[in-house]
């Protein structure tokens, strides 16, 4: 049962109307062993989020009629996604980034995993088995000061790559759709 209307945690319940918009694509690829979530390692040469793990995506441009188009366009640019290779299932609730963007995640099924990092914005494309995420999402969250509050974020590490912050939070929200609950209460 894909329920796209689940709410987000209190940290992210903010008015996001009027903010600049962005969209990301949470791509899933099924193998014989597991369902895998596709992540990107951003290039170290970028002015923001350098070397961080993210989903393919970015800011909405004037030419994008919808946020879904934004997510798909960015995935084409960053990881050479062929539109024929993805089926977009829908979106989950938008979240506000700490930089004042309203980010809308879209969920897509990747029919063939032939993604290639563009080498400019994205250094590497990698997939993480869903069961690994489920079993390794940390319960002691990393904290940061955000709007003068200490905020606790979910995170997990995979092959020396840290998935944290908004990317990990959107991952947890996606897992909720699959009725996989991650205990994020602070210990």
Regions found by a protein language model. Give the residues of each.
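Short Gly/Pro-enriched turn/cap motifs at secondary-structure boundaries
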Residues: 14-17, 97
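Single conserved hydrophobic/aromatic residue that forms the stacking wall/gate
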Residues: 1-12
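Short aromatic/basic micro-patch
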Residues: 5, 54, 127, 165
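A structure-centric signal for secondary-structure junctions around beta-strands
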Residues: 8, 22, 34, 50, ...
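Buried hydrophobic packing segments
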Residues: 27, 167, 171-175
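N-terminal strand-loop-strand
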Residues: 16-55
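Unchanged
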Residues: 45, 59-159, 163, 173, ...
